[in-house]
Structures are given as C-alpha cells and as structure tokens.
C-alpha cells in the first residue's frame, strides 16, 4: 500500500484535518509536509514550488497527495505545472474555480471595514462552520488568529502576489 503525502501550508489549522489523517494512517503511512518562513519576508508561489519540488524529488516514486483549503489550491497549481511529480491528488474543501479562501474574505474585510481582527474573525467563523455558540466561535477564531500570525496567507505580508485561478 502506498503512502500519502499531506501538504499542509497552514499547520495552525491542521486540527480540522487531524481526524482524517489519523484514519488514513491506520492503513497507510501519512507524511505531512510544510515549511516555515520568516513572516517579514516575501514568500511567493515559486518559493513554495521550489521547496515542494525539492522534497518530492527525494521520494522514491510520485506520491499520492492530499491537501485541504489553501494547501489544496497550491497543490493543484503545482500539479498543473509539474504533472509527473504527483501520482494522484485528493483535494478537500478547495474552490475548483478560483483561489478563494477564508483568508481572502478576511483580508478584504480588513481593508474595507474599520473593525478589529477579532470582530472580523467572529463574523467569519459562524459563516464557515454554521455555529452560533460563543465558546466554539472563540476557540475557532483562535485557530484562525494563529494561522494569520504564523502560516502562509496569500495577500498578507508573507506574499505580495495573488494566486492565479485554477
């Protein structure tokens, strides 16, 4: 049975993928891939592709790739550019038409509204999860705050380039 290569560009929200990763790991070896960068440095799509290609080139055979959200968008764009490097690609919660992500909505709202980060996240979380529970919303907002502070977000200081549509 072949292994799974899980691309994870936003480790702060891996908790949403953990259950599936654990289930898959019962029958296959699951390898998680991410990278760290200094958030004060620009991180372009080509930088991510270079890191990803360097890792994939070291594998014995093209991996079966799983990716969620933004990671899935990046994986799809990578697979389009380097089709022979992935054995297969499974995308979870990826907009098949565009590169629209929760972070796109967050950044747009921050640009247009005179609201705090926490106010905007408190508004976005119930839209994403259909939850109206304050405790749950606070916890989920915390995950997204960590993601904004530490993970790759297109359009933030970490990346000045927009992602092309799929």
Residue positions per predicted region:
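Flexible "cap/lid" loop of the alpha/beta hydrolase fold
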Residues: 80-81, 85-115
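Conserved alpha/beta-hydrolase catalytic His-Asp/Glu region
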Residues: 100-102, 117-165
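Conserved alpha/beta-hydrolase fold motif
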Residues: 65-66, 89
